[in-house]
């Protein structure tokens, strides 16, 4: 049975049973705790928690899922995949354990001709949570399973959660016995290679808190209602129904393996275990990478981008180790498109962009391998020379940080060289780097990942946002928090702004979201203790429902239950709306100029400024930048009306509304329309009323922020005027200094630059001529140190390393065939101290090496150097040590 048929039968079965088919969500959701969607139930979490009312009591979906913690196990075992399709059925307060077991058993065991999968009931097993006697009874009653094919297991195996705070509950798993050829008897408890899990039925009834493992977390209490969340692995079922040993042999992954085998010198399944692992890595990772890129991620060095980059680079490395020298990424991505496109049409419609990003990463990493391999070879050689057998963590970190080498590549190359790697040292340096990168952001933002302190307020209901209609609102303080702990009162006592939060029942303040930073303003009130005032410095959402106002209490005290006035700074809001609407305008202009593949990858807008990231390979031309700026400002000048309305998500998409990749949208969405067809986006931010209110948009520049991602920055409104005024003043100053009209400044500057280049070239020629004359005198004055003729001189200032190399060659040629060493050092430009050492063949026969001597030469000038036996060079920063360097060199030669 082909995979597409397995998918169809699953959905048909549950639709007939009264379930609504729900499309797969993106693998990226706006949840800071979740790198990728890793379960079918993730998009339904608000329904399980009771935060939102589900539009249906029963639902079914086949969700794209990604799990990467076991990435190093992929290919080694045949059970691990980074991407999988999770087929699920969900009940929101409707049926519970009996219904879940009945529906699953019917689909699995019904004959194929009746729409089922036709599994032999005698080969199916079930596991349940330790004390779930009810589930055991139902398996015996509904399915007729004998007690010996039902096993009890603990928290680690049969109590399910996402691994983070959220819904959880005991589970019951269904296993298929593949037969004695796959291992010993004894059920799943004894052997999970023989007994393979195909379906997990989760009885979602509790909410969990923070924890450190599958077994160590707090149960916060019951959910508002009992729910069902099940997950059937499409790939595993396909493996069984297609009669193959593992998922890599199925109709979705085998085509990728065959594509690689067509160009690799060694085939798949030829008896080489390591090669088979590499084939599986390529098949698994290519599919995952294509899905991630399709959902809007580009390779990067953090978070999801880092995972994608690692996947792509593991593909490339595995292909290289199979002996494939030609580029393969384009063919692999096309194979995934052909195999999975019928189920995931975005792989077809967005193929050009997906392919472009993957191929660009392949090209970049091939360069990385070429340059980094030299550094690895040097480090390995130095390690062996020192008598050690362990490559340092520092070297491994440099390979990773500077050249992008994944640690597993370094490990493999080290093993081939007969070395191991200090992995602990590497991990320490990596941890320090990540800590440094995140320290500032962590200090500024409190992530609200632990909701236990806010639970009562979250359960009481959401904050009412009034900011679309007014900038000032009367409100009641629902809660006061200091350092995340609830307190009844807070007063002006020097508490830092980020430590105090006020939760209101209603607010006009926009909470940071969608790239728009939070409003600023004040909260004030008059209570029993007098007048109180607080400056609002930030506003963040808690559980997407509560607005937490981070404040600096400037006077008086605030008491829970007080009535207060929340007032947004109108100047701030005006600037924020200009920035946000300007972002939409620039986005529309980008797509008009570059085409539909210029997809948003992120944004930031604040009063007077916007930053827009988009997926694009290579820098924009000057003409493209000018066009984008012109299209944007033409739309501003057109004074388009900005219209907002709320509609159903599917209707908005049908209208062509742009949605941000990875964002999770509710069923009812807000649409922002600027100028009819010019710009139409899903957006919950604040905006101007017409485009002319944005004011001029001035693009400051365009740059790269990662592989395949570009960034445009711009000023809007008054800040744009100020920027233009500065540029005008700068041009006027240049014109005055050059004594030409403004319009002649570019030509005048170009002329001056050419004259300067000519003068510098002539100066270099004269300096080198003088140096060559000095070289003749240097040969005549060569000293004898032991058996070696030595020319060691301090040259006149301004000499470059290239100049010194040229002179060294002249001098060495004039010293003849007897043992000779030439060492020149100079005071170069920008406080640099370049130096070069040359050793002729006769001196090398005496044991002298330029790459050894240059180290003695470098130390006194605080420099570094390296090279080969005949020629080495370097540079330092301490001109005061030049004489000492010359003396050290003489002494070293004298000891030889």
UniProtKB/Swiss-Prot annotation:
Q: Its GO CC terms? A: cytosol
Catalytic activity entry: tRNA(Ala) + L-alanine + ATP = L-alanyl-tRNA(Ala) + AMP + diphosphate
Q: Which cofactor does it need?
A: Zn(2+)
Q: Which InterPro entries match?
A: aa-tRNA-synth_II/BPL/LPL, Ala-tRNA-lgiase_IIc, Ala-tRNA-ligase_IIc_anticod-bd, Ala-tRNA-synth_IIc_core, Ala-tRNA-synth_IIc_N, Ala-tRNA_ligase, Ala_tRNA_ligase_euk/bac, DHHA1_dom
Identify the EC number(s).
6.1.1.7
Keyword Acetylation: yes or no? no
Instruction: State one molecular function term (GO).
Output: tRNA binding
Q: Name one GO biological process term.
A: alanyl-tRNA aminoacylation
Compartment(s) where it occurs, according to its Swiss-Prot or TrEMBL record? Cytoplasm
Annotated Zn(2+) binding sites? 580, 584, 683, 687
Query: Cofactor comment in the record?
Result: Binds 1 zinc ion per subunit.
Any idea which UniProt keywords this protein has? Answer: Aminoacyl-tRNA synthetase, ATP-binding, Cytoplasm, Ligase, Metal-binding, Nucleotide-binding, Protein biosynthesis, RNA-binding, tRNA-binding, Zinc
Q: Where are the transmembrane segments?
A: none
| Record remark on domains | Consists of three domains; the N-terminal catalytic domain, the editing domain and the C-terminal C-Ala domain. The editing domain removes incorrectly charged amino acids, while the C-Ala domain, along with tRNA(Ala), serves as a bridge to cooperatively bring together the editing and aminoacylation centers thus stimulating deacylation of misacylated tRNAs.
Q: Per its UniProt record, what PANTHER family does this chain match? A: ALANINE--TRNA LIGASE, CYTOPLASMIC (PTHR11777:SF9), ALANYL-TRNA SYNTHETASE (PTHR11777)
Query: Function, please?
Result: Catalyzes the attachment of alanine to tRNA(Ala) in a two-step reaction: alanine is first activated by ATP to form Ala-AMP and then transferred to the acceptor end of tRNA(Ala). Also edits incorrectly charged Ser-tRNA(Ala) and Gly-tRNA(Ala) via its editing domain.
Similarity section: Belongs to the class-II aminoacyl-tRNA synthetase family.
What name does the UniProt record give this protein?
Alanine--tRNA ligase
Gene of this entry:
alaS
């Amino acid at each position: 049975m082909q995979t597409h048929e397995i998918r169809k039968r699953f959905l048909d079965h549950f639709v007939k049973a009264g379930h609504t088919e729900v499309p797969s969500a993106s693998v990226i959701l706006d949840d800071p705790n979740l790198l990728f969607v890793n379960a079918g139930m993730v998009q339904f979490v608000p329904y399980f928690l009771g935060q939102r009312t589900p539009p249906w009591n029963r639902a079914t979906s086949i969700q794209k899922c990604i799990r990467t913690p076991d990435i190093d196990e992929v290919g080694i075992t045949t059970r691990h995949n980074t991407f999988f399709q999770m087929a699920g059925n969900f009940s929101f307060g409707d049926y519970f354990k009996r219904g879940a077991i009945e529906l699953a058993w019917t689909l699995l065991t019904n004959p194929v001709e009746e729409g089922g999968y036709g599994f032999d009931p005698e080969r199916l097993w079930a596991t349940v949570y330790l004390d779930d006697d009810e589930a055991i009874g139902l398996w015996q009653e509904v399915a007729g399973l004998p007690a010996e094919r039902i096993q009890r297991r603990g928290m680690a195996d049969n109590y399910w959660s996402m691994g983070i705070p959220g819904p959880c509950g005991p589970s019951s798993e269904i296993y298929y016995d593949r037969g004695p050829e796959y291992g010993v008897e004894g059920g799943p408890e004894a052997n999970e290679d023989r007994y393979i899990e195909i379906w997990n039925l989760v009885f979602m009834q509790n909410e969990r808190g923070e924890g450190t493992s599958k077994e160590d977390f707090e149960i916060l209490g019951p959910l508002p209602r009992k729910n069902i969340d099940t997950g059937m692995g499409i790939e595993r079922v396909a493996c069984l129904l297609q009669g193959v040993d593992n998922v890599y042999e199925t109709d979705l992954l085998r085509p990728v393996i065959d594509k690689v085998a067509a160009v690799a010198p060694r085939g798949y399944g030829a008896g080489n275990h390591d090669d088979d692992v590499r084939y599986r890595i390529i098949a698994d990772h290519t599919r995952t990478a294509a899905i991630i890129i399709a959902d809007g991620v580009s390779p990067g060095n953090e978070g999801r981008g880092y995972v994608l980059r690692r996947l792509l680079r593991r593909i490339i490395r595995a292909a290289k180790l199979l002996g494939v020298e030609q580029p393969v990424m384009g063919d692999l991505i096309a194979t995934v498109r052909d195999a999975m496109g019928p189920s995931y049409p975005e792989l077809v419609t967005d193929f050009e962009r997906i392919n472009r990003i993957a191929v660009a990463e392949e090209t970049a990493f091939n360069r990385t391998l070429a340059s980094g391999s030299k550094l690895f070879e040097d480090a390995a050689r130095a390690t062996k020379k020192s008598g050690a057998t362990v490559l340092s963590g520092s070297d491994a970190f440099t390979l990773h940080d500077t050249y992008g080498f994944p640690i597993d590549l370094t490990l493999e190359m080290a093993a081939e060289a007969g070395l191991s790697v200090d992995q602990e040292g590497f991990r320490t340096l990596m941890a320090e780097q990540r800590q440094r990168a995140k320290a500032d952001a962590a200090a500024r933002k409190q992530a609200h990942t632990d909701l236990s302190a806010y639970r009562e307020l979250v359960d009481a209901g959401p904050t009412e946002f009034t900011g679309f209609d007014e900038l000032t609102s009367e409100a009641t303080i629902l809660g006061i928090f200091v350092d995340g702990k609830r307190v009844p009162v807070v007063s002006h006592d020097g508490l830092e702004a980020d430590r105090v939060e006020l939760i209101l029942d209603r607010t006009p303040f926009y909470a940071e979201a969608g790239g728009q930073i939070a409003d600023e303003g004040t909260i004030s009130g008059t209570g029993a203790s007098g007048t109180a005032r607080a400056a609002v410095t930030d506003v963040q959402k808690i559980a997407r429902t509560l607005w937490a106002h981070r404040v600096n209490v400037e006077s008086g005290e605030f008491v829970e239950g007080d009535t207060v006035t929340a007032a947004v700074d109108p100047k701030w809001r005006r600037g924020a709306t200009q920035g946000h609407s300007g972002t939409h305008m620039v986005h529309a202009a980008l797509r008009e100029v570059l085409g539909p593949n210029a997809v948003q990858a992120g944004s930031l807008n604040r009063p007077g400024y916007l930053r827009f990231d988009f997926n694009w390979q290579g820098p924009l031309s000057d003409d493209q930048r000018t066009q984008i700026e012109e299209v944007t400002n033409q739309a501003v000048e057109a004074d388009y009306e900005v219209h907002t309305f709320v509609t159903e998500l599917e209707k908005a998409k049908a209208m062509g509304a742009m949605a941000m990749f990875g964002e999770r949208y509710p069923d009812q969405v807000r649409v922002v329309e600027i100028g009819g067809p010019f710009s139409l986006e899903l957006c919950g931010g604040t905006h101007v009323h017409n485009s002319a209110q944005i004011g001029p948009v001035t693009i400051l520049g365009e740059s790269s922020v990662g592989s395949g991602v570009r960034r445009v920055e711009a000023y809007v409104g008054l800040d744009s005027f100020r920027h233009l005024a500065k540029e005008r003043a700068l041009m006027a100053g240049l014109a005055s200094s050059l004594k030409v009209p403004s319009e002649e400044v570019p030509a005048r500057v170009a002329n001056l630059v050419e004259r300067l280049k000519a003068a510098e070239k002539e100066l270099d020629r004269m300096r080198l001529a003088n140096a060559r004359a000095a070289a003749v005198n240097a040969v005549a004055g060569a000293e004898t140190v032991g058996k070696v003729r030595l020319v060691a001189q301090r040259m006149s200032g301004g000499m470059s390393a290239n100049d010194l190399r040229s002179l060294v060659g002249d001098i060495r040629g004039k010293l003849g065939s007897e043992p000779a060493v030439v060492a020149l050092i100079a005071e170069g430009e920008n406080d640099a101290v370049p130096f070069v050492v040359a050793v002729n063949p006769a001196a090398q026969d005496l044991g002298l090496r330029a790459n050894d001597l240059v180290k003695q030469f470098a130390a006194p000038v605080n420099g570094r150097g390296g090279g080969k036996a005949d020629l080495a060079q370097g540079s330092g920063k301490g001109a005061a040590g030049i004489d000492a360097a010359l003396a050290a060199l003489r002494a070293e030669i004298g000891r030889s």
